Amino acid sequence: MQNKTVFVGISGGVDSAVSALLLKQQYREVIGIFMECWDNTLNNDQLGHRAFNEHKSGCSSKEDFREAQAIAQLLGIKLIKQNLVEPYWKQVFLPTIDAFKNGLTPNPDMLCNRLIKFGLMRDYCKQLDPNSDFATGHYAALSWDNNQPLLAIPKDKHKDQTYFLAHVKPAQLQDVVFPLAHLLKTEVRQIALAHHFSVATKKDSTGICFIGERHFSDFLKNYLPVKPGVIYDWKTQRQLGSHEGVWFYTTGQRSGLNLGGQAARNFVVEKDLKTNTLYVSSDPEDLQRRGITLSHFNWLYQPNPLTQTVLVRIRHAQPLVQGHITVQPNNVVQVQLDQPIDRVTNGQYGVLYTQNGICLGSGIITASQI
């Protein structure tokens, strides 16, 4: 039993509930933190919102808070509700919209973890108790090298969330605890059922960090204008149809193209922001890339000597692919892959790992090579 306080993020889901339960067995005091980061009304979130479209309340954050309160009451712990709607809007959401405007496909979860969860929220907890630890229900693990915490792949490889954590600052991992590091998701649900948690069978949350599931192109229309343009065949340059604006589409996307009558199903292979043009293809090889340029690289771990052979992931849950890196000036890392991967998308993140599952860090994909 650790004679100190641990703050734990409680979202109203099963993972954070079981995390809080496990921490109660390990710490003198456990305090739950519920982060409210999105307001449907203030943020004009109507188009694409499933609850609004189905004539429901649309107040998923209120429902989540009620679940969090029930968990805290069952465990006998204090729960603090922290309103972070404004900083989330300014620091995470507006930069995300700006990236879409620039033709990129950003990942707001990366910014959210760095700036909100492990930024403002962790800092707030440290202000309340400088000696406290900070815990979340992420499926991630920590290893150690000379008192430096290293982000590592957890036991449950299928639920591994280290991809989303790879852009936090190294210092933000100090005094952090991941209670689910050595558990499978099935084991987490079994623990929740055994302790009669109402969220034991609750569906896993998906969608955008703190916003949830949306019909995504419709959701973006709350914040970006419709701007009709032309769709061309990537190889023949033949005009195939029209679209509503390149920022509503991403590399590899098949749905929403409305290209009926084609011999094979097409997908997006290129976006030209200047001319507002989409290029599509039905040949999967047109999506494949062997080289990736990562900019603004955030090093979580730099072993000495730095390994040149790494494992690479360009999206959550994608199988790891081996590659070789060249470190360039200005925090740029060039990756050459041993085998091609598809749907390499500018604006997304490339995350690098050692062969034994330690996360080296992440960078924003700014270019790719055939």
From Swiss-Prot:
ATP binds at residues 9-16, 35, 137. It is an enzyme of class 2 (transferase). InterPro entries: MnmA-like, MnmA-like_C, MnmA-like_central, MnmA-like_central_sf, Rossmann-like_a/b/a_fold. Its EC number is 2.8.1.13. Its main location: cytoplasm. GO terms for molecular function: ATP binding; tRNA binding; tRNA-uridine 2-sulfurtransferase activity. GO terms for biological process: tRNA wobble position uridine thiolation. SUPFAM superfamilies: Adenine nucleotide alpha hydrolases-like (SSF52402). Pfam families: tRNA_Me_trans, tRNA_Me_trans_C, tRNA_Me_trans_M. Residues 107-109 are annotated as: Interaction with target base in tRNA. Residues 159-161 are annotated as: Interaction with tRNA. The keyword Manganese does not apply. It catalyses: S-sulfanyl-L-cysteinyl-[protein] + uridine(34) in tRNA + AH2 + ATP = 2-thiouridine(34) in tRNA + L-cysteinyl-[protein] + A + AMP + diphosphate + H(+). Keywords: ATP-binding, Cytoplasm, Disulfide bond, Nucleotide-binding, RNA-binding, Transferase, tRNA processing, tRNA-binding. Disulfide bonds join 112-209. It is found in: Cytoplasm. Catalyzes the 2-thiolation of uridine at the wobble position (U34) of tRNA, leading to the formation of s(2)U34. This is tRNA-specific 2-thiouridylase MnmA. It comes from Mycoplasma pneumoniae (strain ATCC 29342 / M129 / Subtype 1).
